């Protein structure tokens, strides 16, 4: 509590409801770390306003990307995050694809001569797997043994397919606007959250749900 108070006393600006320089990283970090207290909604509003003021584009880099992406995701702003990422301009992943990148590049603009095989901007991976595909640990658990599967289709996405390997085997998710198929490895179990909020408890094996 004392450290949070000291942090807010030093960096929070009540007149603008922002932190530090007011940049996207400056506001996303304390939001993600739970330092904003009663000012959470105001700081979140300031963050969203800054994103929109930049044409729905990010201004973060290697340090701030993860906190921006996860702050938006954890506050239900996945459609905004999708709009920030689903384009072919710089800064953005589409610009790298447009210029022939087959691996992540060190700079948003791959033509700047830096490394062409660099995980510098790879923090989006967490959002793809944990939010879009919805592959998560059940709260209070670790190691992807007790799973929470909660896919989120945003924007104009028609489907999402993903798989990842845990200590227990391959976990796979295939979700469309009308169905969800999951494959849970032996030794694991999962809570499945359907789009209407209905929860299903399943063990290992392949399970399909229509909605």
Regions found by a protein language model. Name each.
Residues 53-92, 99:
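Repeat-solenoid scaffold signature
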Residues 9-27, 47-65, 111-120:
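Solvent-exposed loop and edge beta-strand segments that line ligand/cofactor-binding
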Residues 6-14, 92-95:
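Secretory-pathway/luminal and periplasmic proteins that interact with or process carbohydrate-rich
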């Amino acid at each position: 509590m004392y450290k949070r108070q000291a942090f807010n006393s030093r960096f929070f600006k009540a007149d603008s409801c922002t932190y530090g320089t007011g940049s996207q990283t400056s506001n996303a970090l304390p939001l993600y770390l739970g330092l904003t207290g009663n000012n959470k909604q105001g700081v979140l509003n300031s963050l969203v306003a800054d994103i929109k003021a930049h044409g729905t584009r990010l201004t973060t880099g290697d340090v701030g990307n993860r906190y921006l992406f996860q702050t938006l995701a954890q506050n239900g702003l996945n459609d905004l995050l999708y709009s920030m990422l689903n384009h072919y301009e710089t800064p953005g992943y589409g610009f790298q694809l447009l210029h022939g990148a087959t691996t992540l590049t060190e700079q948003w603009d791959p033509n700047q001569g830096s490394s062409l095989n660099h995980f510098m901007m790879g923090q989006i991976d967490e959002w793809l797997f944990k939010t879009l595909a919805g592959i998560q640990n059940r709260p209070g658990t670790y190691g992807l043994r007790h799973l929470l599967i909660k896919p989120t289709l945003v924007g104009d996405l028609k489907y999402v397919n993903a798989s990842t390997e845990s200590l227990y085997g391959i976990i796979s998710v295939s979700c469309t606007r009308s169905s969800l198929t999951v494959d849970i490895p032996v030794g694991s179990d999962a809570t499945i959250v359907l789009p209407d909020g209905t929860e299903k408890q399943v063990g290992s094996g392949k399970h399909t749900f229509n909605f």
